[in-house]
């Protein structure tokens, strides 16, 4: 039973064997020197021998050699990321949204994690008035002092709760700048989406 569950978790959208290119699309990751050395020593001895070989090889690297490895891996990552973004652009935002919903549903049913795709040319959705207020609160000590919110908050949950309470108690004239800015950002977003043909 456990084996069956693991197979289901592996066969998620992130590694799907289906023909749909969007379903198989996963973002590149920046490889480590260890990853690269595993590739370079493929077929060289059994597991323990190979790992010891890599350990000794890494231990003997000079600072310049380590930097060369890092530069090479960064170049590979940049090239892979560029290809990834170009591939994403070949799909419409609607297709990507549909795929994200499918991934979410499948991940929920298997208990797996999934990567949410995002069209490179679509801007992030504008922040709500409360989120704009929350960001200002985090970066403005004077505002925190005015609202009686202490500087040091132990947890993010407590920080959010304090911000939510402060927002609810905030006078309407104090809320207005955040509400107006949120509306303006929403209008800009909607205009861009329409002009770009994403709606």
From Swiss-Prot:
One of its GO terms (cellular component) is mitochondrion. Keywords: DNA-binding, Nucleus. Coiled coil: none annotated. Residues 123-197 bind DNA. SUPFAM superfamilies: HMG-box. GO terms for biological process: mitochondrial chromosome packaging; transcription initiation at mitochondrial promoter. Its main location: nucleus. It is found in: Nucleus. SMART domains: HMG. Monomer. This is Cytosine-containing mismatch-binding protein 1. Binds to cytosines in base mismatches and opposite chemically altered guanines. May be involved in repair of DNA damage. The gene is cmb1. GO terms for molecular function: DNA binding; mismatched DNA binding; mitochondrial promoter sequence-specific DNA binding; mitochondrial transcription factor activity; single cytosine insertion binding; thymine/thymine mispair binding.
């Amino acid at each position: 039973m456990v084996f069956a569950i693991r197979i289901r978790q592996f066969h998620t959208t992130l590694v799907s064997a289906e023909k749909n290119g969007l379903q198989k699309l996963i973002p590149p990751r920046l490889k480590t020197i260890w990853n690269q050395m595993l590739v370079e020593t493929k077929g060289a001895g059994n597991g323990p021998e190979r790992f010891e070989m890599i350990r000794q090889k890494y231990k003997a690297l000079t600072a310049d050699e380590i930097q060369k490895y890092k530069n090479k891996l960064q170049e590979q990552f940049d090239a892979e990321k560029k290809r990834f973004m170009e591939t994403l652009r070949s799909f419409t935002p609607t297709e990507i949204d549909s795929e994200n919903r499918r991934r979410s549903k499948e991940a929920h049913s298997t208990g797996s994690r999934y990567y949410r795709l995002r069209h490179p040319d679509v801007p992030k959705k504008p922040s709500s008035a409360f989120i704009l207020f929350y960001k200002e609160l985090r970066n403005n000590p004077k505002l925190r002092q005015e609202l009686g919110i202490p500087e040091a908050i132990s947890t993010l949950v407590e920080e959010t709760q304090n911000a939510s309470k402060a927002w609810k108690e905030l006078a309407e004239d104090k809320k207005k700048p955040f509400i107006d800015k949120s509306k303006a950002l929403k209008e800009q977003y909607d205009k861009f989406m329409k002009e770009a043909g994403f709606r």
